[in-house]
């Protein structure tokens, strides 16, 4: 986040703290929120928590001005979606709690006001995508630049963390593009490509970087290039030779690493093990 803010600030400069901001006193703040269409119940339940947060910074006055200006811009933006604006205000509360009121976060948004509109659109239209940002606010850097930092090293846990972030970032970026274009074929095609890349990278890690002895044939929605958000994977393993004990171990490791949930992004993918390849036969 700091790196992203530094780059943006160096290009565009610091924002003016005298720009539009929330009204100074509570009655005027409530009047402002009500004039934007927020319900009295929502304002009473959420606004005190939002406005009374304190920014973590060594330059309190400057960064508090940034925080209040961010609140003004974001709340004005979510009020453009009246059907969901009360829910969006609640999501904003969770988002700021997750961000822990870091000054670099507010600076990033103010130096790229288009980001305010983008995230507000996500909050207004997709609680699922909003949940991704709330659970992993550090994804904002990669979301801004539409790219992910390259992975250095081959530690299994670092690889899993990298692949998990890759999946979440794919859902966030492609999901946002879908909100703008409503192009469903493009969305499911990109999500399917991401699943292809993640599973091949995982197989390569399990095989120690060597040529994969295990091959995967995708079935179901994955095989039909129709993966959606939160889709599970259906597939079978293929081998060019009779399966050996080492092949079975690799398959077990693949299943475990694909579905384990202790990493920050949760599991990479879920697998429905109730499916039986031969009817009543076991897995």
Feature annotation, model-predicted:
Residues 1-283:
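Non-catalytic regulatory/linker segments of enzymes
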């Amino acid at each position: 986040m700091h790196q992203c803010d530094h780059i943006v600030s160096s290009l565009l400069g610091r924002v003016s703290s005298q720009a539009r901001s929330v009204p100074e006193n509570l009655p005027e703040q409530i009047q402002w929120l009500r004039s934007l269409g927020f319900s009295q119940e929502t304002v009473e339940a959420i606004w005190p928590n939002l406005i009374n947060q304190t920014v973590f910074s060594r330059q309190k006055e400057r960064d508090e001005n940034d925080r209040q200006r961010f609140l003004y811009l974001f709340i004005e933006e979510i009020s453009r979606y009246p059907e969901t604006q009360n829910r969006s205000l609640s999501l904003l509360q969770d988002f700021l709690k997750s961000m822990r009121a870091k000054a670099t976060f507010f600076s990033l948004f103010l130096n790229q006001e288009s980001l305010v509109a983008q995230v507000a659109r996500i909050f207004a239209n997709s609680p699922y995508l909003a949940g991704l940002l709330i659970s992993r606010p550090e994804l904002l850097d990669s979301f801004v630049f539409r790219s992910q930092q390259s992975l250095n090293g081959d530690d299994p846990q670092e690889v899993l963390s990298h692949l998990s972030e890759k999946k979440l970032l794919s859902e966030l970026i492609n999901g946002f593009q879908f909100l703008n274009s409503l192009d469903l074929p493009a969305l499911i095609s990109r999500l399917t490509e991401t699943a292809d890349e993640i599973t091949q990278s995982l197989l390569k890690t399990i095989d120690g970087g060597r040529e994969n002895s295990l091959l995967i044939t995708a079935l179901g929605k994955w095989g039909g290039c129709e993966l959606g958000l939160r889709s599970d994977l259906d597939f079978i393993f293929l081998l060019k030779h009779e399966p050996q004990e080492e092949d079975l171990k690799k398959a077990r490791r693949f299943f475990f690493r694909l579905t384990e949930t202790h990493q920050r992004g949760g599991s990479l993918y879920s697998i429905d093990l109730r499916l039986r390849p031969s009817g009543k036969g076991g897995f």
